[in-house]
Amino acid sequence: METNVDFSSISSKLYRKYAQHVRNLKDVCVSKTVMKPGAFFDSLQQMMEEEAAATTPPRDLSSVADYAELFKTLEEYPANLQKMPKKRELQRTNSTLLRGADESVAMGINTSNVSLSLTRLEEQRSAVDVYNDFKGFQRKLAKIYDEAAALDTTESIYKQKLTQLHGFAQQLEKLMPTGGESPPDAFTSEQQEKLLTIAANMEQLNYLRSNSLQLPNPNEILATGSLAARLEMFVEVLTYTLLQVSSYNMAMI
């Protein structure tokens, strides 16, 4: 009676007990041999001859009955092979396969069409939602167009301002002296002192205005000759003069 030996249990016990000597066990149990090329090819030739002798029929075919038996064996195909069908049968088989393929494709198309038609209506967007999205898109486009137009308007305004500044700079260049001699002072020393006095009086007047102090009536100014009232009238004259000069400069530009 043959005894079944579980080599996996034996190997697991050996690996568990002699884990550190696994390499030594392999070297002892496995014999390694290296053959020379000549000896390898001689042994290969011998193995091929032995294989050919095993598959070659033991006797020669000498009679018609032996040949008939051989052809009968060739006509019988094993289970994993199929006999090659004739040409007419092959054409009939191909046409059947093509017809079946066309029917399967048509069936798949019909199935997809049916699945599309069975899609729930609530999963599809309504016409109202599409129209609302379109109107929102139109509003965004109009807003972007207005912003672009505003930018163009601002750019044109800045261009006009730059043109005016360029003209003003040209006018200033014309007014600047070109000779090497230093130009005379615009005001004499006495005039400068008067202007400084006027500026100090204007500061006092601004202080009076900022503190809401009451000034006398112009009729009282003429009657009494108050200094503060006279300064008030002088400031009004200067303001009018400055406005006229500014208007003239703007007209020149």
From Swiss-Prot:
- How far does the signal peptide extend, from start to end residue? none
Disulfide bonds, which pairs? none
GO terms under biological process:
cell division; mitotic spindle assembly; mitotic spindle-templated microtubule nucleation
Q: In this entry, which stretches build a coiled coil?
A: none
A GO CC term attached to the entry: microtubule
Q: What is its main location?
A: cytoplasm
Localisation per UniProt entry: Cytoplasm, Cytoskeleton, Spindle
Kindly state which keywords UniProt assigns to this record, in alphabetical order: Cell cycle, Cell division, Cytoplasm, Cytoskeleton, Microtubule, Mitosis
State whether it acts alone or in a complex, and with which partners, per the record: Component of the augmin complex composed of dgt2, dgt3, dgt4, dgt5, dgt6, msd1, msd5 and wac. The complex interacts directly or indirectly with microtubules and is required for centrosome-independent generation of spindle microtubules.
Q: Its biological function?
A: As part of the augmin complex, plays a role in centrosome-independent generation of spindle microtubules. The complex is required for mitotic spindle assembly through its involvement in localizing gamma-tubulin to spindle microtubules.
Name-wise, this protein is: Augmin complex subunit msd5
**Which species is listed as the source?**
Drosophila melanogaster
